[in-house]
Amino acid sequence: MMRRRNKKTKTVISNPETLEERNKFDEIPHDLVIEILGRLPAKSVARFLTVSKLWATSIRSLDFIKSYPLGSSSKPRTLVASKQVVANPSTGRTIPLPRVKTRRTIATSFFGYDSVSDQYKVLCMTVKAYGDLRDESSQHQVFTLGAKKKSFRMIDTSIIPHRPCSNGVCIDSVVYYVAKTGAGMLHLCIMRFDLSSEILDLFTSLPQEIRPPS
């Protein structure tokens, strides 16, 4: 004898207050929502990626990324790593960079966004840790994130001997940094690296009254 089982049905009762709050929230102009998101910390913005496809697309858009403030009023955090990585503070994701092939011992890297090719690039400069600083040569290599070739590639540069002494700043696909140059590396200048053409050159010399850090 076969017994017939009754199928249980599950009834979901929506909370009227929750639906009302969501309807009110949807009435907020999207431009105002983007303005509000731009004032939030990066970690908070990342949480809103799952709200809807529209929000995720807007947050990942180039316009929102460019308009998002670089600075933060909170205390800076330190990332400790045994090798070079590119880190996304909003998601906590890190991408390890390939090893730089060189016999030189000092490496300085700069990171920037190339709006022409829509790619992120890393410029690595390597110099010797010994020798005559007045005649210091350097090598420059570039790594493109997302490229098929997962390695740095050497670029041709014919520039004045210099040694970086500051972090880089990327503005309109150009990375700028302060460097020591001149006799005994006692003068300061601003170097620039065009991420699109991959050309490194001298942007300007700083007044002699400005002394390099010891």
Swiss-Prot record:
Q: What's the domain of life for this entry?
A: Eukaryota
Sorted alphabetically, which InterPro entries does this protein's record hold? F-box-assoc_dom_typ3, F-box-assoc_interact_dom, F-box-like_dom_sf, F-box_dom
Q: Which SUPFAM superfamilies match?
A: F-box domain
Which stretches make up the F-box domain? 22-68
Report the coiled-coil segments: none
Query: Mind telling me which SMART domains this protein's record contains?
Result: FBOX
Entries under Pfam families matching the protein: F-box (PF00646), FBA_3 (PF08268)
PANTHER family assigned: BNAA05G37150D PROTEIN-RELATED, F-BOX DOMAIN-CONTAINING PROTEIN
Protein name as it appears in the record: Putative F-box protein At5g15670
